[in-house]
From Swiss-Prot:
CDD domains: DSP_DUSP2, DSP_MapKP. It comes from Homo sapiens (Human). Belongs to the protein-tyrosine phosphatase family. Non-receptor class dual specificity subfamily. GO terms for biological process: endoderm formation; negative regulation of MAPK cascade; protein dephosphorylation; signal transduction. This is Dual specificity protein phosphatase 2. Expressed in hematopoietic tissues. Interacts with MAPK14; this interaction does not lead to catalytic activation of DUSP2 and dephosphrylation of MAPK14. InterPro entries: Dual-sp_phosphatase_cat-dom (IPR000340), MKP (IPR008343), Prot-tyrosine_phosphatase-like (IPR029021), Rhodanese-like_dom (IPR001763), Rhodanese-like_dom_sf (IPR036873), Tyr_Pase_AS (IPR016130), Tyr_Pase_cat (IPR003595), Tyr_Pase_dom (IPR000387). The active site is at residue 257. Induction: By mitogens. It is found in: Nucleus.
Length: 314
């Protein structure tokens, strides 16, 4: 199906819609940029669209199957197909018009699937002229802020900024996602630092680190050692379920092990891979940019590669 029926929407017009609560509720905004770009900054109302080599191959399938891959939320797809949404708006990095889109680009593929699946209903399908770059310049107040680097907590515990402390204990926990933080056992023992980050739950990925504040935070323990014999992948779904539970309850979770290098980093990588449907190398680069010391052991990396196959082929 061609894209002749796709309308084009100006950035200022989208801003007007998103500032109206009623119209914002009836607008589905889909961001086709790479995952790392989305996480750095995005329109607050937007949903990321997964895209990888496997999805590129599946994009040659029936429109309904393509839409299921690019919009995994079944309830949202149902609302869309039933015509309960007034409009679906697709955006990329900065394309000025639909005519500029390559046929194999995620924005082109998604627009085609949306047009086909909504053809009998009232939902209008739009492409945002100028993409995120244009919208960010026009309506910066409707975009998320780039994550700030973690700062050493102030107060009595000065060891976090002490150059004598191990590098993995310096600074504070780092924000991976707005509700997901990664750090070390030392970070998990700093009450002031946890409160400064808004932490409400702690996922302890170790067999030896204590849970310091059980009366203040919700804890979950994954009692594994950091060695080549451990099957950490057996814990992936339980850990992912806990993180999602914290997210859905409006909280924030710190994932830590002893040093915040191998075990807890592995759990965060698995979470990103499944929740965002991205490859291991993409998730690794994303986390590495935020916590440069991460280094899952060789066995954990192998298990993550196997998990990647499961996630992307699901």
């Amino acid at each position: 199906m061609g894209l002749e029926a796709a309308r084009e929407l100006e950035c200022a017009a989208l801003g007007t819609l998103l500032r109206d609560p009623r119209e914002a509720e009836r607008t589905l905004l889909l961001d086709c940029r790479p995952f790392l770009a989305f996480c750095r900054r995005h329109v607050r109302a937007a949903r990321p669209v997964p895209w990888n080599a496997l999805l590129r191959r599946r994009a040659r399938g029936p429109p309904a199957a393509v839409l299921a891959c690019l919009l995994p939320d079944r309830a949202l797809r149902t609302r869309l197909v039933r015509g309960e949404l007034a409009r679906a708006v697709v955006l990329d990095e900065g394309s000025a018009s639909v005519a500029e889109l390559r046929p194999d680009s995620p924005a082109h593929v998604l627009l085609a699937a949306l047009l086909h699946e909504t053809r009998a209903g009232p939902t209008a399908v739009y492409f945002l002229r100028g993409g995120f770059d244009g919208f960010q310049g026009c309506c910066p107040d409707l975009c998320s802020e780039a994550p700030a680097p973690a700062l050493p907590p102030t107060g009595d515990k000065t060891s976090r900024s002490d150059s004598r402390a191990p590098v993995y204990d310096q600074g504070g926990p780092v924000e991976i996602l707005p509700y997901l933080f990664l750090g070390s056992c030392s970070h998990s023992s700093d009450l002031q630092g946890l409160q400064a980050c808004g932490i409400t739950a702690v996922l302890n990925v170790s067999a030896s680190c204590p849970n310091h504040f059980e009366g203040l935070f919700r804890y979950k323990s994954i009692p594994v050692e950091d060695n080549q014999m451990v099957e950490i992948s057996a814990w992936f779904q339980e850990a992912i379920g806990f993180i999602d539970w914290v997210k859905n309850s409006g909280g924030r979770v710190l994932v830590h092990c002893q040093a915040g290098i191998s075990r807890s980093a592995t759990i965060c990588l698995a979470y990103l891979m499944q929740s965002r449907r991205v490859r291991l190398d993409e998730a690794f680069d994303f986390v590495k940019q935020r916590r440069g010391v991460i280094s899952p052991n060789f066995s954990f990396m192998g298990q993550l590669l196997q998990f990647e196959t499961q996630v992307l082929c699901h």
